[in-house]
Structure formats: C-alpha cells, structure tokens
Amino acid sequence: MIEIKMNIRWNVILGVIALCALAWFYSLNQETADLSELVKKPDSPDYVGYKMETTVFSPDGKKQYLALSDKIEHYTVNEQTLFTAPLVYLYPTTSNEKEKEKNANQNVDFFSTQSWKLSANQARLTKDQILYLEGNVVAQNLTSDSRLQRIETESAVVNLKTQDITSETQVKIKGKNFSSTGLKLVGNLRQQVATLKEQVKTYYEVSKQ
C-alpha cells in the first residue's frame, strides 16, 4: 500500500511539473509572437497616416504645392511616399506679369494662388519630387482665361519642381475653344503648354455670334 501511494504521489508531482513546463513554453511562444509583431517587416512602411494635408515650400519660401490624401505610406529605405486618392494643388513659382498684375488689382497674392489641381486614384512621390500618378488622372487648371484648361489620362508623371508633365497613355486635353486626343503627352503646366504625339486628333469649337 505504501508503495502504491508513493507511485501516485510521484505521478501527481510529475503531472504538475509537466503542466508548469507546458504553461511556461506557451507563455514563451506568446512573448515571441508579440515581439515579432513589434519588429517592422522589410517591405512595410515606416509611417502611415490618414486624411493627411501637407504644404511644401520652395527654397525661397514660396508655396510649391499642397498635397491632400486619404492615406499616405512613407518608406525611408527608398525615400518614397505612396498616396491613396491624392489631391495635389500646384502654385506658380515664377511670375507671369499679366496674371500677376491682374491679381494685384484684385488684392490677391500671385504666389499664394493655386494654379493647377492634380487628382488620381493612386500616386507615388520620390525624393526628387517626381510624382507618378495612376488611374483616372486629371490635371485641372484653376486660373481664369487659361489656354490649357484640362488634361485627362490614365497615367502621368509630374515634376513638382518644374511642373513638367509627361504621359505614355492615351491623353485628352481641353483648351480654350478646342479639345485634342493623342497617345502620348509632353508639356509644362506652369507654361500651359501640352504637345500630343501619335494619332493626334483636334476638334475646334466654333463660337456662335
């Protein structure tokens, strides 16, 4: 009887030890899992923001562009920022004397007046301020009596420093009393210049007297 009781006691003790070991092993795995969640994955962004608004200034202190987005993701490793549903407002960085004089008469600061609005489904901004726009890309001129009023395409690249714009997809542009389509685009938003290439078609609006 004594031997049987000793065996039972040892079995209980060993069972308790086994349970403690299992509990310790489980808690160790949980801590490891928690720590792995804290470690940033190589392909994950360093910063994520929602409903963001950012104003960027030129070296001489003038507004260069205003960017709004439903979501942004910034990656430090390649110094790129991804935008979801971006809106980018461009400002004039050199003075057009005619427009400057007109705004002065209306007590409007020329360099604080937004000149173009860019929109797209997605966008990617590089460290050199090159903006890659993808999906339902629209460049809308916000100034009055502009020669070039609107650009529509599916993909475009805009240099935010120089306001050069290019596209390798089908493009439609609308200007004062005309509209044109083509397969490629080279232009400059600041200068209101857009040159279409390949299969270009232009339609003129005849004003009614």
From Swiss-Prot:
It comes from Haemophilus influenzae (strain ATCC 51907 / DSM 11121 / KW20 / Rd). GO terms for biological process: Gram-negative-bacterium-type cell outer membrane assembly; lipopolysaccharide transport. Keywords: Cell inner membrane, Cell membrane, Membrane, Transmembrane, Transmembrane helix. GO terms for cellular component: outer membrane-bounded periplasmic space; plasma membrane. Its main location: membrane. It is a single-pass membrane protein. It is found in: Cell inner membrane. Component of the lipopolysaccharide transport and assembly complex. Interacts with LptA and the LptBFG transporter complex. Belongs to the LptC family. This is Lipopolysaccharide export system protein LptC. GO terms for molecular function: glycolipid transfer activity; lipopolysaccharide transmembrane transporter activity. Pfam families: LptC (PF06835). Signal peptide: none annotated. PANTHER family: LIPOPOLYSACCHARIDE EXPORT SYSTEM PROTEIN LPTC. Involved in the assembly of lipopolysaccharide (LPS). Required for the translocation of LPS from the inner membrane to the outer membrane. Facilitates the transfer of LPS from the inner membrane to the periplasmic protein LptA. Could be a docking site for LptA.
